[in-house]
C-alpha cells in the first residue's frame, strides 16, 4: 500500500453512558491519530450500522470492529485495536 493512502473511516452511532444513541468521534481519536501519523489521509463517514467502525481503502473493506472496543480519546499508541487497524491499512492492496 502506498505510504499516503486515502482511508475512509466509516462509523455508526453508539449509546453513551447517558443512554443516548448518536454518532460520536471521541472513540475514534486514537485510531485517526495513528493513521494520520502514518501519513494517510482520513475521511470520516457516518453510517447507520450501530457500534460499527469500518476502514475502507481503495474501495475495499480492510478492517472492522465494535466502536465501543476502541479506547476513549488518547493517541491510539496503547490501543491494540488501533495497531491492528494500522497493520490492515498497511497490508491493503
From Swiss-Prot:
Entry protein name: UPF0728 protein C10orf53 homolog
Family: Belongs to the UPF0728 family.
Natural source organism: Xenopus tropicalis (Western clawed frog)
S-S bonds: none
PANTHER family: UPF0728 PROTEIN C10ORF53
Amino acid at each position: 500500500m502506498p505510504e499516503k493512502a486515502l482511508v475512509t473511516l466509516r462509523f455508526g452511532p453508539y449509546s453513551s453512558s447517558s443512554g443516548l444513541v448518536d454518532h460520536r468521534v471521541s472513540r475514534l481519536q486514537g485510531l485517526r491519530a495513528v493513521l494520520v501519523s502514518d501519513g494517510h489521509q482520513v475521511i470520516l463517514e457516518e453510517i447507520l450500522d450501530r457500534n460499527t467502525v469500518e476502514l475502507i481503502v481503495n474501495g475495499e473493506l480492510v478492517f472492522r470492529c465494535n466502536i465501543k472496543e476502541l479506547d476513549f480519546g488518547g493517541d491510539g499508541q496503547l490501543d491494540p485495536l488501533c495497531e491492528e487497524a494500522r497493520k490492515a491499512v498497511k497490508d491493503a492492496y
